């Protein structure tokens, strides 16, 4: 289990009522960037650490422009280009933290967190079966790791270094 309770009610309020957190990061919002360590960005893609990770090695890969549907808002070429980044990030993550299995999924909702993003999550070795799969991602049940900017900077640096060797 992670160390800190996750306030799902506050998260839901921010997700439903607040501005798009991905767009804030893409636009350079200092507060969002302080909370979500950016690993890589260019004109098309944004890669950063999840602010509320359940395990070390929880990364989000997003298109830079605001799109809300995994297939309907992308051309096939745009979609494939983003999936290349998901693959690269997954490989860099596996080289950066102990990983028994890598999870890749798109989560979000038209009711909140609408900006398409892929969760790329390293499942640490040795977790009990019931703590794997959706159990690993259930922040409101599992809890989250305490926010630690120094740890995040170090992890982002390792992932970034491993991205360059791919």
Task: Briefly describe each language-model feature range.
Residues 1-166:
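HIT superfamily nucleotide-processing domains
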């Amino acid at each position: 289990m992670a160390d800190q309770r996750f306030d799902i009610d506050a998260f839901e309020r921010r997700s439903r009522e607040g501005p798009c957190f991905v767009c804030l990061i893409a636009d350079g919002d200092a507060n969002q960037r302080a909370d979500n360590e950016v690993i890589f960005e260019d004109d098309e893609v944004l890669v950063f650490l999840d602010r509320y990770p359940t395990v070390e090695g929880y990364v989000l890969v997003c298109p830079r422009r605001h799109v809300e549907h995994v297939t309907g808002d992308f051309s096939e070429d745009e979609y494939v280009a983003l999936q290349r980044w998901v693959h690269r990030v997954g490989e860099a993550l596996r080289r950066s933290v102990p990983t028994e299995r890598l999870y890749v999924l798109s989560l979000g909702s038209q009711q909140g967190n609408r900006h398409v993003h892929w969760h790329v999550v390293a499942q640490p070795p040795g977790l009990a079966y019931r703590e794997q799969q959706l159990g690993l991602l259930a922040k409101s049940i599992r809890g989250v790791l305490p926010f630690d900017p120094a740890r995040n900077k170090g992890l982002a640096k390792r992932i970034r270094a491993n991205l360059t060797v791919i």
